[in-house]
Amino acid sequence: MDFFSEYGDANRYKIQEVIGKGSYGVVCSAIDQHTGDKVAIKKIHNIFEHLSDAARILREIKLLRLLRHPDIVEIKHIMLPPSRRDFKDIYVVFELMDTDLHQVIKANDDLTKEHHQFFLYQMLRALKYIHTANVYHRDLKPKNILANANCKLKICDFGLARVAFNDTPTTVFWTDYVATRWYRAPELCGSFFTKYSPAIDIWSIGCIFAEILTGKPLFPGKNVVHQLDLMTDLLGTPSMDTVTRIRNEKARRYLSSMRKKQPVPFSERFPKADPAALKLLQRLLAFDPKDRPTAEEALADPYFKGLAKAEREPSCQPITKMEFEFERRKVTKEDVKELIFREILEYHPQLLKDYMNGTEKTNFLYPSALDNFRRQFANLEENGGKNGDAVPSDRKHVSLPRTTTVHSAPIPPKDHQNITSQVPQRIPGRTGRGACPVIPFENLSAMGPYNQRRVVRNPVLPPATTNLSAYAYHRKSDSSERELQQELEKDRMRYQPSEHFMDAKVVSHMSHDLRASSYYVSKAKSDVADRAALQSNMMQGIGPFNGIAAVGGNYNKVSTVQYGVSRMY
């Protein structure tokens, strides 16, 4: 039956090789055999061993669902666990990126001014979207910005991010703040509590941009004192008014007693950089956070003249408080497990529909395909990260579900209202495509009713995926098999996805017109000739940005960037 084959995604992906390992688990590259796309599958194991780790994972997958933007890494799918109550690992499918910005900087000592400009533009455009949602990343650094050889950047790793609400306390404790010191704003030096402010991310972007310009970190401090010394060596000693806003007493006392230092002209520190770039950099690295521009203000800087365009730099509506109610309450591991399961259902529309309607029976058949998928991961690790011989299946028909049924129970009732029973406004998960946009908002329709990247949140249920799978959802029904088939067919037709976007593939010897608006609407049944003409028009480069996407354009100063080892997601 189609219903039973809709959710078994383990057979959908063919594992290629290990591209990253860490304390959290393993990342493998894979092929989506339904679409042919290359993806990265992150296995996160024992996620409920520590409550803080589970909350971080929940925070990240929730934010990546809510923040759909071309310059933010996309979760394409999360595999359905074998049961609602007993799962310990999750498999998260990301779009595959070649490397990260740290490796790009390390492997390239000849990045051009066009590279510099385009890199900063993408980072600020993503930051504008993030900040207008009232989200602060708090851990921006080159390793947390994924990159492709065609110069496409995407921000990732939202595990330390926070959402600010109007009624949150003015001072927020950052006991988990462990971000790299080199990219930490001066007001955070030595502090584990501060006021939420988008200026902390702006400072980090300034440090990253300076590193792009020079090829090495700007403030590689060995400790807090050394970090402050490096900052003041370049920027000069801050005013007493600025010093009083430093929350750490030792840092404040040290800056107050510091000998007077004059700022170093940025033209001396960065002699080869574009003067317009240095003017903007100086604003990004203002010692006083109130003097730093917002991401939107930075995008309007003259440095981006001819490149920036307001219609392809969207804002995001603020995230609703209900989405992050778990951050404001004391929750148990079982609470977080239920919330993570709820997030996973965003990528399984039919199950989510039953869950939201209260008709979900919480009975899942354990598909043997997931066992086979786990063996593929284990086989890769045993073979040093390379795919050896195919792992044989235990049974001939591995796509068929096992006969055993795992029953799960709901979270026991508590004195307080269960936070998982509240239905927040949501952005549905996207089963997605694999092509990384090179021009702003490639493949994006501003009008599609089921477009999860719309600026305005869409409370309508997402279209059910048309991809086949072998996950089985066991549901009891008094109706006959024929009536059930008709009901399922009716549901599938109701949520049939429409084409609201158009592929714009990158081809050799062409680059994109970055000054053209990339918002466009394509009908579900567009004429083939019209589609081809539109694609051709959007892939024609116009100087001086011809070749800025680094896909072999005619602009001979821009080339495909080199990169080192692929990073972990």
From Swiss-Prot:
InterPro entries: Kinase-like_dom_sf, MAP_kinase, MAP_kinase_CS, Prot_kinase_dom, Protein_kinase_ATP_BS. Dually phosphorylated on Thr-175 and Tyr-177, which activates the enzyme. Residues 13-304 form the Protein kinase domain. It is an enzyme of class 2 (transferase). Activated by threonine and tyrosine phosphorylation. One of its GO terms (molecular function) is protein serine kinase activity. A motif (TXY) lies at residues 175-177. Belongs to the protein kinase superfamily. CMGC Ser/Thr protein kinase family. MAP kinase subfamily. This is Mitogen-activated protein kinase 8. The lineage of its organism: Eukaryota, Viridiplantae, Streptophyta, Embryophyta, Tracheophyta.
